[in-house]
């Protein structure tokens, strides 16, 4: 099957197969913002399950800007002696383990952040404004400091034995906020034109590249729905993807819909969900036309048949799985065996209408 093929990334690193675990926040960090034995056990188990690439849950670059209470943080002044053990556990069986680096921007909850920071002082829309305080606009000096923090964290990841990093540019967090004309209304070099709004992610990538060298994988996660909601035209978002690919990005992960079972199949779904799914599919096809960089698609993949079909069509190079891998850690081995397996994962709901 296509799933068992290796993949060489632009930096020269090789993934042993076409399956990747997309980031899911573990929420298991210790009190001092460090990782611990729980991470080693979890990622060791996943590495035994056959997957080619493990992407960790989001690791923050500033202890004063957390997305969740139990995030791990990598910054100067925090010594995490467990990082090499976590990396070693995730590298078993020739598996790649990349750390997802993130800053939440305005999406740091009230109980964690009195005054979150963002490109502009624009609150989140109702009813989310009940959970998050109105942010303060970042100064230029703070923006430069954040770029340096991403680079420092990536260097620590490399020195600790992790085999790559992924910039979290999705789900409305800081990188995504800079890109969005809705959230970024600055009138300096960091906002306004698309070129200016792209400057932050571009500088983060270049700073990381400088700190880790040319042979260490750097990926980014983007969400098609972010672009849809963030006031982007599809053309603008394609420019972002194309630019990142040309800079030398090793893997672009795209989420934001369901690839394998689109809503067009007639399942009872809200109109907004149907539109999002359709957008996601065309989005992925348009990205593929424009970039040479390897693509990882995450969303709704449940069956070996659907995964192989997506790879065979050329739509993507890596299949991203998340919940199915959490519930069945051996799911990759089953898929790679050629068996016609299907994940039994059911959609999760929060009970909050505006989120579900």
Where are these regions (language model features)?
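Flavin-dependent oxidoreductase catalytic cores
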Residues: 1-356
């Amino acid at each position: 099957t296509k799933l068992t093929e290796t993949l060489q990334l632009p930096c020269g690193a090789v993934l042993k197969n076409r399956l990747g675990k997309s980031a899911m926040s573990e929420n298991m960090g210790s009190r001092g913002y460090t990782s611990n034995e729980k991470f080693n056990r979890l990622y060791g188990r996943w590495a035994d399950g056959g997957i080619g690439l493990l992407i960790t849950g989001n690791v923050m670059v500033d202890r004063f800007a957390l997305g969740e209470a139990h995030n791990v943080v990598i910054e100067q002044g925090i010594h995490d002696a467990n990082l090499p053990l976590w990396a070693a556990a995730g590298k078993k069986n020739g598996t790649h383990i990349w750390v997802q680096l993130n800053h939440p921007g305005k999406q740091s909850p009230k109980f964690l952040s009195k005054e979150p920071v963002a490109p502009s002082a624009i609150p989140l829309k109702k009813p989310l404004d009940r959970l998050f305080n109105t942010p303060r606009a970042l100064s230029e000096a703070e923006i430069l400091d954040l770029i340096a923090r991403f680079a420092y964290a990536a260097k620590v990841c490399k020195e600790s034995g992790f085999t790559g990093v992924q910039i979290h540019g999705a789900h409305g967090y800081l990188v995504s906020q800079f890109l969005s004309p809705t959230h970024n209304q600055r009138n300096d070099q960091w906002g306004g034109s698309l070129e200016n709004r792209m400057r932050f992610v571009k500088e983060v990538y270049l700073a990381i590249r400088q700190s880790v060298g040319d042979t260490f994988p750097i990926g980014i996660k983007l969400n098609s729905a972010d672009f849809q909601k963030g006031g982007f035209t599809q053309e603008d978002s394609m420019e972002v993807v194309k630019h990142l690919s040309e800079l030398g990005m090793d893997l672009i992960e795209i989420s934001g819909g369901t690839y394998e079972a689109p809503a067009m199949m007639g399942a009872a779904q809200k109109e907004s969900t149907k539109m999002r799914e359709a957008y996601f599919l065309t989005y992925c096809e348009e990205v593929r036309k424009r970039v040479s960089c390897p693509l990882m698609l995450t969303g709704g993949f449940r069956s070996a048949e659907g995964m192989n079909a997506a790879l065979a069509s050329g739509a993507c190079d890596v299949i991203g799985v998340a919940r199915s891998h959490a519930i069945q850690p051996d799911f990759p081995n089953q898929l790679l065996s050629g068996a016609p397996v299907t994940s039994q994962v059911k959609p999760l709901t929060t009970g909050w209408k505006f989120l579900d």
